[in-house]
Amino acid sequence: MGESGPVVIDPRRHDAVLFGVGDALGSALASQLGQIGVGTAAFAADGPAAAADRLRVRPGRCVVVAGDPAAVEAARTAGFALVIGLAPVGRDGDGLRGAGADAVVAELEQITVRTGDRRMSQLPDASQALTGGADGLAGRHPAVFFDFDGTLSDIVDDPDAARPVAGATAALTRLAARCPVAVLSGRDLADVTKRVGVLGIWYAGSHGFELTAPDGSHHQNDDAAAAIPVLAQAAGRLRDELGAIPGVVVEHKRFGVAVHYRNAARDRVGEVAAAVRAAGRHDALRVTTGREVIELRPDLDWDKGKTLHWVIEHLRRSGSGALTPVYLGDDITDEDAFDAVRGGPVQGVPILVRHNDDGDRATAALFALDSPARAAEFTERLADQLERGEG
């Protein structure tokens, strides 16, 4: 996050905010956080990591606000998700930046809070989206987008062992005969294409930096391609730095470096996150997080949501007519697509595939399914509906 951009606390990504400054717990910011279910606490000499332990929250899903470079550095070393330096007017913030602050503000009022989302447990079942009504699909022509891991496939300890759940590929094949279908994954394009193996659909890899159309034509983000050698170097350094930690896997992809820590000891996760964030700062790469993974990618304003809009626009120019976007995903990176589906020219249907990895976090989705198996069943039912001419 650059200092020139907005500083946002997002309950989809952040479970708590830890303050190391003055009477911040009595501030309007702290009050607003409490209203949306984001925890708050103060820390002192024992540091932010101890405060996170007391709140029983993970540093990787917490924000630290501190005015002391030592506290900023401690938060950075512990792997906190967002570290905000507070430098009142007249005070130089360079020391906070040098200690690793993601952003520096002059007052708490410069920090904004995302509101309006619901918790995962509050979402109605996606079967309701198959009906009519403002949010339903009856009588509409959909374009359906899927994440892979955690949506079409169960999350497994070994990412290389992931496969579509029973019935998923058959349902995708039937659906693709009736409407545009796309799989948008953080995996490499070749990897996700091979794992799904359904012909006649769109595939996007690396969160949309590279994709193929149903006719086999290939598209890539050329600005992102400039970062390929930098990512390769970062992957090598992270393997050297983290390779001795049991359970950590450094996965080098064409447009990214994913560091998986699902099988690592919990007391090593902060160390892993800190190393990846340091690599991102060193090489000017963007850091994103997911379910037991932290990733480096090109620092460009591109994500699954923008990829979805690009595909919809491509289909429109090809004469598809009005399309209602539907997106099924489970992870934090899928929230960009949920935002895109809700904020596009046509109100779409964002569907979260629920899990327990991040607790009952907030989401921009409007509907939910309880597992990849339920996502496959939903896909089958939608294909049935379209085959009957009810779409």
Curated annotation (Swiss-Prot):
Catalytic activity: alpha,alpha-trehalose 6-phosphate + H2O = alpha,alpha-trehalose + phosphate
Pathway entry: Glycan biosynthesis; trehalose biosynthesis
InterPro entries named in the record: HAD-like_sf, HAD-SF_hydro_IIB, HAD_sf, OTSB-like, Trehalose_PPase
Pfam families: Trehalose_PPase
UniProt-annotated binding residues for substrate: D147, F148, D149
GO molecular function, a single term: metal ion binding
EC number from the UniProt entry: 3.1.3.12
Protein family (similarity comment): Belongs to the trehalose phosphatase family.
NCBIfam families: HAD-SF-IIB (TIGR01484), T6PP (TIGR00685)
Name of protein: Trehalose-phosphate phosphatase
Source organism of the structure: Mycolicibacterium paratuberculosis (strain ATCC BAA-968 / K-10)
